[in-house]
Amino acid sequence: MSDRFSLRDVTLAVEPGQIVGFVGANGAGKTTTIRAALGLIKLDAGEVHLFGQRCGADAPDESQRHLRSRIGLVLDTCPFPSTLKVGQIEALVGPAYPTWDRETFAGFIKRFGLDPKAKVKDLSRGMGMKLQLACALSHQAKLLVLDEATAGLDPMAREELLDELLAFVADGQRSVLLSSHITSDLDRAADRVICIDNGSIVF
């Protein structure tokens, strides 16, 4: 992506209880849009609102921390230090979230079949995704954002992830933004799909 890349007239809303698919070719602006929505880059124009509150790189730090604590992020590659063990991730991530629940995290680690003694670098792509998801689900997030998280997963792992997302929004109070190029995943799980091309929303 060039330094001159920009988003233009992007309007994107994710309502409670929805899984919204977000599609576009590589370099179309999906990740940039997600970074803007999370307040990680400064906007030249426009505003981002999360849970009814304005959020952005120029918003007060305390406000940003509070809003981001309600968001769970799952990336295409596991971002945790490669030499840490699964059981050590809680000490790294937990303090960042006042709503972190140790029992919930331990439950997901067991449910997902993650070995607490395994190092991050030795996890398969699917297990790395599950570790991220366990973290995202352990601090009572209201919005899950997945940036190509299903890419490279085998069909069974993708099915398991989609099942978790559907269960996550089932109460009608939580939402998912699912960036993916795998249309079958979106057909199965998404309530609606938004397409971006060259920095602009197409539909």
Residue ranges and their predicted role:
Residues 1-9, 16, 57-61:
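A short, flexible loop at the N-terminus of ABC-type nucleotide-binding domains that lies
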Residues 38:
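Helix-to-loop junction immediately C-terminal to a conserved catalytic motif
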Residues 144-148:
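Catalytic Walker B motif of ABC-type/P-loop ATPase nucleotide-binding domains
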Residues 46-58, 66-67:
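Conserved ABC transporter NBD signature motif
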Residues 23-25:
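The feature captures the beta-strand-to-loop junction immediately N-terminal to the Walker
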Residues 28, 155-157:
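Helix N-cap at the start of a conserved alpha-helix in ABC-type nucleotide-binding domains
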Residues 75-132:
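ABC-family P-loop ATPase nucleotide-binding domains
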